[in-house]
């Protein structure tokens, strides 16, 4: 009697499937219903010993793995992810439920949402761009709500926020994958999200950022960077209240957020020569509670302050994996509970203005809804009026900034 894979115990089949490269698993799904069920199961997609990450390195996307076998953490670059032509570069990355939102470096007319596992992608045309100095001034977030059929319907949030005393200007808009339309949101921010921390973290369909209370300059504490987090709810399309971080981050300190197994948030706080990692015990739209997870000294690793906004933790072995760019090199710092530090050199990027950003990645069967066909809806007249008003204000703002720039030949004292 010939033994086939179908005759093997279910647990053994799970182990076999978990070691098959993603590019082959898609074909296996079509073989039989049992195999498709196994592939869809969470136990197959999440491996506690070895998990996957997507890294933005040198304007390219790479698949990485992090392993905690035997409590000895390690990272490895598996290879380059290709969604576009080799010449297309990615400047910003956002992850949500296995989907990657890619902001293109040299094309400010569109963004791309990509599912590497299914090989699906969708190009989304943006209504306008704002790139003074050559840098995209927008913040982005990808999230979803559950429709009447309990299916995930995705949306894209896009905004920028100037909070200068005399020239406050905000523009928040959201794109609905179902309708294929943009909508201007009526937002009056009572918060400030740091520009260099604006990638945010996706958790259960919503997005969280580090933030602080919005105050006029004369009434604000100039030394506080952030002391709260804020959530955008994609169901209600609104921001929640500021909820406190377990610390107040002052200047010369580092704060960044991460997601823990798609269930909790973690906050990394570096001050002086001490690093603290906190994990949420409760996390909701309008409330949060924290528990300290790790505290360790980094006297032997002052370069930890070059962290570029990416870190992961292993709750079982109490290890933090932090990504940084000291001395213009991409590096991984692996820090244990006792404060021991090991660093892995990933090399020098070819583009010195690029930055290293890493996000967790779990293969997903979520399909990207494609644009409506011939029955595409049109923007409402009221939305068109709101959009035109904002465009007029933006033009005036850009003129103001051009006028304020030093003239060529002016001496700077």
Curated annotation (Swiss-Prot):
Pfam families named among the record's database cross-references: F-box, FBA_1
Domain F-box residues, every copy: 2-53
PROSITE patterns the record matches: FBOX
Keyword list, A-Z: Kelch repeat, Repeat
InterPro entries associated with the record: F-box-assoc_dom_typ1, F-box-assoc_interact_dom, F-box-like_dom_sf, F-box_dom, Gal_Oxase/kelch_b-propeller, SCF_F-box_component
Kelch repeat ranges, renumbered to this chain: 156-202, 331-379
Alphabetized PANTHER family for the sequence: BNACNNG10540D PROTEIN, F-BOX PROTEIN CPR30-LIKE
Protein name: Putative F-box/kelch-repeat protein At3g22870
